[in-house]
Structure formats: structure tokens, C-alpha cells
UniProtKB/Swiss-Prot annotation:
The keyword Ribosomal protein belongs to this UniProt entry's keyword annotation: no
GO biological process, one term: translational initiation
One protein family per Pfam: zf-CCCH
Compositionally biased intervals (Basic and acidic residues): 35-47
Zinc finger map (C3H1-type): 44-72, 90-118, 157-185
Protein name in UniProt: Zinc finger CCCH domain-containing protein 43
A cellular component term, taken from the record's GO annotations: eukaryotic translation initiation factor 4F complex
Alphabetically ordered keywords of this record: DNA-binding, Metal-binding, Repeat, Zinc, Zinc-finger
Organism: Oryza sativa subsp. japonica (Rice)
Keyword Zinc among UniProt keywords: yes
């Protein structure tokens, strides 16, 4: 029957295997039960252990495995060490590093190294974690001492000293891990704990009496509970009602310094010599409003400020004074130690002091304050300020909108008109890309601005066109003066200054010429300005570091004037003369060609002849030599001279013929000069310039300079 019971409950039945060895043979499970049958492995003492079973805890051969399958459960009290024979000891050989680290060796008895005996590890004392153990742990002792706890759950350690944190606050942040003593509140130390907490509560009361708490809190403590820190609720935050705070406010004695300070503040703000709040007398206690922003201010600030308007001006003048003013006031203050500190009991005393005390610092104050100076702006400055704001945002897209704004600025005098033209020229130099737009703006102003009366009664009325022409002439005359000053800068120590000035003058000259070219198209200035342009270019060509070459001159003039209908015969002849100078044994690539090759002996005669032949004596005898040289070139120029006349030889050669001349000049195909020629000769004006150069060196040099300019 026992076997039947085992079969019924699903227990394995012992089975004899081999040499009297017993094992358990599982019975088939009862129907309706899903319990998994544990896999069985034979135990064979004396046989080597099954390595697969030892490593993974199972064996695929099961009950038929011929090796031993030890019990995986540890046996308490048994020696778990492996036999010493498994790891050989070889004195004199180095120790097996793997055995020393891990206590085992995979080679076993076949290892060639020494396996020293391992030192037994003493059993370590294990304790609970600090938060879980309630015992007192003493280092160096294996015996555990039980620690008692007080009513608050803190350890009692007599003889180790009192916990200062606990004695001051009634709690301990270290809890059961604290190494000091925490006596019960009812012990001999109760008086000390109660007195310390009473001081803490009184300090909190002083703080809460000043602050504004509004309505009372729901959870409150009585006075008895406040002075009993031993109860568990004492760890929570202490709260008070408004009545308790007011009662404490009346009982607490406020220091006299604080009362005096509050009195001074009330005098400054309210103008009343009263003390309100917790510092008032007990018989006349005024309950302040504990709603900080609910009460409305009933004081008449407007009438008070109107009555003391002069006082406000005094403080304005004081704040607007500069640093010397303030330093002088401070020096005067420190020189008189009896007046170094002032105390006013009321507003009337303060006003009386201001009226009676002489202020010497007002003697050095400016007659017109800075705030008033800022408000006084002349009509001219206001107009110029408006014009600058408009021109700073000037663009072709906004032209239609901004041109009307310029007219609305009320340009009402000749001085304002000159300043407007100066602003336009400054913007042109800074933004040369908008030259055509600014020329269009000048046309609009010329049409819509009425003439202005002259400064002198004998002169004619000043128009916009006349003022613009005068400005152009002044620009080139001043540029000529600057160029002459730059030529006087000699020495290595002034090379940087000379270079910077040359660059500035060159950029200004190019910007002004571009703008004048656009004005010539609009017929706003006469062609006489061409003489000044040529003179300015010749002056810039003398620069040492930033010279303005002939290529720049030709590009500027030909792009704007040559195809323009506004440019008359005079300007065209002038341009042709400068180009045709290359044919008359003059340096082809130098703008100063006339100054180097004209016969000096006939120079004065040529200038006098050109001056006599000019009708109405338009040419000034004090003109520079460049004007005479250009007149000489104009006289030599003939309309039938096809080689020097740009207009007659226009389009005379095809592009293929000109490219042959380019190759013949030394610009091999694939070079930078040949590439630049293919880009430039699409336009007829560049082909005409190239044909006027008669030497190969001159043509090749012209292409090289054009390549540098385009870069």
C-alpha cells in the first residue's frame, strides 16, 4: 500500500539500478494533474562527476549516464574544499596565476606551475543595514549589544554625550544611526529641551508677526502643545492663527531702534508722526490691514505734487548734474561735519530745511538743463534728422514712397538744400550701386522744389540744379587739394597713412564719377564737369600705393557717357582725345602721357594758343597743366582720324579678327588674358578700346589690368 500511496500522490518509486544502486522511477501522473515531473540523474560514488551536469545542472543522457551526478544542494557542515590532489604543489616553480586569482585551475594535475595552499578566510561579521538594525554596533567586538529607543524612536546611549541637534530642535536628522544619547522628554534634561524650544518658538513668533499671513490656517496648536516637543505632532510645521499672532505682537517688546526706524519710514511716506503696527502703545493699538493690496490709497498725490512742484524741480536738477557737480556737493558736505547727518521729524521740517539752506552747488549748474537742451531742436536739425532716417532706408523698391516723404520734410532754405545735397553725395560714396536711383531722386527734387532766395540781394535765386553743379565742382577741387597733400607724405613711417588716404580718395573719386555719370544722363549738370573728372583721374594716377589706372578711367567714362545722348560733342572729343593719345607717341598705358612726351619748349605756347582760341575765355588762366594738355589733344583730334576716333571705328572689326590680335599680343589660349578677352569683347565698347592700342605690349598689359580689375 505504501507504493500505491506514492503512486497516487505522484511521488517517485525507488528502483534498483546496477550494483545495488537505488534510484527513483517516476510514476505516470494522475489524470487531471499538470505537475511537471522532475528529471532524475543517477548518483555513482567513486565515478568522476558528469562535467555537463556540474556546469549546467542537467544531463541529456538522464538515468543512463555512466558518470556521477552529485547533489546540487549544499550540505551544511560538510567540507566544500576540493581534494588537494587536484592541484599539484611544485616548489621552485612559479605560482599558477589563474589559481592564485580564482582558486581553481583548468589543467588540474597536468599543470606545470605551483599551486600553493590557500589561506582560510575568517568568517566576517554581518549586521543589518543602518536603517533596519536597532542595535548598538561596537567595532572589534563580535557581540551585538541591544540599544534602547526613547518615545520618539531615537537611540538611548548613556555615557556617550547628548545630541546637540536633538536638544535644540527636539528631533534628530540621523535617526537611529546617531551615535549620541537622546534622552526622553520627561527625564532630567526636560527643562533644557523646553527652554530651547521656547526660544525657537519666540523667534518664529517675531518673524510671523511682521509677515502677512491673510486668513488663519486650518491646523493650529495650542500654547501647551507648542511647549511640548516630545509629542509626535511636534515634528510638523508650526502654524498660528491671526489672533494668536496679534496677541503675541502685543506682548513682545520691540527694540527702540526698530520703533525709531518705523517712525522715520511713516514720516517719509505718510507725513504723520505716528507709529502703527506692533510697536504702538498698548492702549491705542491699531490693527494694520493684513491684506497687502486690498486697501486703496486715499492720499491726494496729485495735489501734493502740485504744491511741491519746485521741490521736484530741485531733485531733477540734482539728478541731471554732472560728475563734478556731485563731487563738489560731497566735498562741501564732508567739510562741514556738523551738517553731515540730518534728522527730520516731519515733512514741514524737511521743507523748511530746503528753503533755508543755501545750495552753493547750484552756482556751477548749467543755465539750461540737459533735458531742456534735448527738447530745443532747431528746424534745420529736425529736417536733417528726418532726411537721414529716410536716406538710411532708401532703396529702389521704396523710391515711390520715400520721394514724397523727402518733399514733406519742408526744405525751406538754401542752407538746408546744401546739407541735403551733401547727404546724398555721402550716401552715393557709401552705396555706389544705387547711383542711378539717387540720380532719379535728384531729378524728382529738381522738379518739385521751388527756387530759394539768395543769401545776398544782388544774386539770383538758388535752384536745386545750380546747387548740385556747385557741389560737384567743390568735390573735385577739394579732392585735388587732398591729392597734393598726399604727395607731401614722404618717409617710411608715413607709408601706412599715405596708403590709407590714397585708398579713401580713390573710392570717393570713383563713387562721385559714377554718380556724375548718372546725372549727365538725366541732364542735371553740364558737360564742363568732364574737365574736372579728367583732372581728378590724373591726380589719382600719381598715387604710389593705390593708383587709378587708365583702365579704370575708360571703364567709368565709356559705360556711362559714350552711348549717352546727353553727352555732347565736347565730352566725346575729350574721351577720344584721351584714347587717341596712344597713337601720338605717348605712353599707351599711362594717363600722364602728355606730361612725359609733350615738348617742354612749346608747352607755354600751346597752352596760350588753346586759351586764346576758346570762345568767351571759358578757360581759366590759372588752370592746371592737365587742362591745357587735354585742350591740345582736342585740337589735334580730327573727325577723319579713324584710328583714334572711337565713334567712327565702332564695330569695324569682327570678334574673330580681334581674337587673332589677342593671340598675336601674347595671350595664349587658356591663359587668364585670353579668357578675359572672350568675356569683354562681347560688348562693342571694349573692342573699340582694344583697337586703339597699337602695340602688343600695350594690348597685353591692358588685358592683364582688366583681369585684375574684374577680380
Amino acid at each position: 500500500m505504501p507504493q500505491d500511496d506514492d503512486w497516487f500522490w505522484g511521488r517517485p518509486t525507488p528502483v534498483v539500478v546496477g550494483d545495488g544502486e537505488t534510484t527513483s522511477k517516476p510514476k505516470p501522473p494522475v489524470a487531471g494533474k499538470t505537475k511537471k515531473v522532475e528529471e532524475q540523474h543517477p548518483r555513482r560514488p567513486g565515478e568522476p562527476d558528469c562535467s555537463y551536469y556540474v556546469k549546467f545542472g542537467s544531463c541529456k543522457f538522464g538515468i543512463s549516464c555512466v558518470y556521477n551526478h552529485p547533489d546540487p544542494r549544499p550540505q551544511h557542515g560538510a567540507d566544500d574544499k576540493k581534494p588537494a590532489e587536484q592541484f599539484p604543489r611544485r616548489p621552485g616553480e612559479p605560482d599558477c596565476s589563474y589559481y592564485v586569482k580564482f582558486g581553481s585551475c583548468k589543467f588540474g594535475m597536468n599543470c606545470r606551475f605551483n599551486h600553493p595552499p590557500r589561506m582560510p578566510v575568517p568568517p566576517q561579521q554581518e549586521y543589518f543595514s543602518g536603517n533596519a538594525c536597532h542595535c548598538h554596533h561596537i567595532e572589534g567586538k563580535s557581540k551585538v549589544e541591544q540599544v534602547k529607543l526613547n518615545v520618539l524612536g531615537l537611540p538611548l546611549r548613556p555615557g556617550t554625550g547628548l545630541c546637540s541637534y536633538y536638544m535644540n530642535r527636539g528631533i534628530c536628522k540621523f535617526g537611529t544611526n546617531c551615535k549620541f544619547d537622546h534622552p526622553d522628554p520627561g527625564s532630567d534634561h526636560e527643562k533644557w529641551v523646553v527652554s530651547s524650544n521656547a526660544n525657537q518658538v519666540s523667534s518664529q513668533v517675531n518673524i510671523y508677526s511682521v509677515l502677512d499671513h491673510g486668513e488663519s490656517n486650518e491646523h493650529t496648536f495650542t500654547s501647551e502643545e507648542v511647549h511640548q516637543p516630545g509629542i509626535p505632532s511636534f515634528h510638523q510645521r508650526i502654524s498660528y492663527t491671526r489672533d494668536q499672532l496679534l496677541q503675541l505682537c502685543q506682548n513682545v517688546e520691540v527694540p527702540k531702534d526698530i520703533l525709531k526706524f518705523c517712525q522715520d519710514i511713516n514720516v517719509e511716506l505718510n507725513g504723520e508722526d505716528k507709529i502703527s503696527g506692533f510697536g504702538a502703545e498698548k492702549d491705542h493699538v491699531q490693527t494694520p490691514s493684513y491684506k497687502r493690496f486690498d486697501a486703496t490709497d486715499s492720499r491726494d498725490w496729485h495735489s501734493w505734487s502740485a504744491q511741491t512742484n519746485w521741490e521736484q524741480k530741485f531733485w531733477d536738477n540734482f539728478s541731471e548734474a554732472k560728475e563734478p557737480y556731485s563731487l563738489g556737493w560731497k566735498q562741501e558736505k564732508f567739510n562741514k561735519p556738523d551738517q553731515s547727518s540730518f534728522h527730520f521729524d516731519s515733512k514741514d521740517q524737511w521743507l523748511k530745511f530746503i528753503k533755508c539752506t543755501p545750495c552753493k552747488s547750484t552756482l556751477i549748474k548749467a543755465e539750461v538743463p540737459l533735458s531742456i537742451q534735448r527738447g530745443i531742436i532747431s528746424g534745420k536739425d529736425e529736417v536733417l534728422k528726418t532726411l537721414k532716417s529716410i536716406l538710411n532706408t532708401f532703396s529702389p523698391k521704396m523710391f515711390d514712397l520715400q520721394k514724397g516723404q523727402l518733399i514733406e520734410t519742408r526744405i525751406s532754405s538754401a542752407d538746408i538744400l546744401k546739407d541735403v545735397i551733401n547727404l546724398i553725395f555721402e550716401k552715393v560714396v557709401a552705396e555706389p550701386a544705387f547711383c542711378s536711383t539717387y540720380a532719379q531722386l535728384c531729378t524728382y527734387l529738381n522738379q518739385n522744389l521751388t527756387p530759394f532766395p539768395p543769401e545776398d540781394c544782388d544774386c539770383e535765386e538758388i535752384t536745386f540744379k545750380q546747387a548740385l553743379s556747385n557741389k560737384c565742382q567743390e568735390i573735385f577741387e577739394s579732392a585735388h587739394t587732398v591729392c597734393s597733400e598726399i604727395g607731401k607724405l614722404i618717409g617710411q613711417d608715413r607709408e601706412m597713412e599715405q596708403r590709407d588716404k590714397e585708398r579713401v580718395v580713390k573710392l570717393e573719386t570713383l563713387g562721385n564719377i559714377n554718380f556724375i555719370r548718372a546725372l549727365l544722363k538725366k541732364k542735371l549738370i553740364t558737360n564742363k564737369i568732364i574737365d574736372h573728372i579728367v583732372q581728378a583721374v590724373m591726380d589719382c594716377c600719381k598715387f604710389r600705393f593705390e593708383p587709378l589706372g587708365k583702365v579704370d578711367l575708360l571703364n567709368i567714362i565709356f559705360e556711362g557717357m559714350l552711348d549717352s545722348d546727353s553727352a555732347g560733342d565736347e565730352s566725346n572729343i575729350c574721351v577720344n582725345a584721351m584714347i587717341g593719345g596712344n597713337k601720338s607717341s605717348i605712353a599707351s598705358n599711362d594717363v600722364e602721357m602728355t606730361r612725359k612726351n609733350v615738348n617742354r619748349q612749346n608747352e607755354e605756347a600751346i597752352l596760350q594758343k588753346s586759351y586764346d582760341e576758346v570762345p568767351n575765355n571759358k578757360m581759366d588762366p590759372q588752370k592746371n597743366y592737365a587742362d591745357g594738355a587735354i585742350s591740345y589733344l582736342i585740337e589735334k583730334e580730327k573727325p577723319t582720324n579713324l584710328e583714334s576716333s572711337v565713334r567712327i571705328c565702332r564695330g569695324g572689326c569682327s570678334i574673330s579678327e580681334i581674337m587673332e590680335l589677342v593671340v598675336d599680343a601674347g595671350a595664349v589660349e587658356g591663359s587668364d588674358e585670353h579668357f578675359m578677352a572672350t568675356l569683354l569683347f562681347i560688348k562693342p565698347e571694349y573692342r573699340e578700346i582694344f583697337l586703339t592700342l597699337d602695340t602688343r605690349e600695350g594690348r597685353l598689359g591692358w588685358l592683364k589690368r582688366m583681369y585684375k580689375v574684374k577680380e
